[in-house]
Amino acid sequence: MCQNLVSQELPVLSTTSQFNREQRFNHQENGNYARDTHNERDQYVGLWEYNQNGILFLLKIEKMNRVINKIEAPGFETIYNYFDLLILRYRLVKDNIVVFDNLNENDVDPIANYATKLGSYSFASGRIWDRTRNVRGSHTITRLNTNPAKIIFNLERFDYTKVNDSSFYQDGQPLFSIPQNGIEMVKID
């Protein structure tokens, strides 16, 4: 069982920097805390909007520090580590109908909707859960050097996990309800 628990405290046994590419293989070590030592996450924080072709997609990105990833299995030693993450929430409206909205919810599931910014990579990457279609997909978020501030949110086409039985997805609908293929989003807050 893999969990992310914000409130549970276990001792930090070592610390690595998410900015230091040489330490990237040490981030997952038991008891490690992978910290955002260079404030790389700041550039992504805010409310971002995509509004085209009858689709309004709002993406709220917030920082969450020291999120625990804990793995427990009967008969094995508990393994855990901490990460500084970006947490994603979203509202999806299609043809003026709200399809999904958790923008203002307080419950946070960091394992479902998150991103990390590692090293000198020009993007943050992680997973997002399309709650309408019940599919978890990998994504990248690239900050553009523009005014107004913009990002490219790219929900990957080929890296996903279907949560429902495969028969659920044979309804002639696209696999994801969230827009895909590198959409440009503008910062509105």
Predicted regions and their residues:
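Amphipathic/hydrophobic helical signal segments and adjacent flexible N-terminal regions
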Residues: 1-45, 49-54, 66-83, 152-189
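Central antiparallel beta-sheet cores of small beta-barrel/beta-sandwich binding domains
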Residues: 59-146, 189
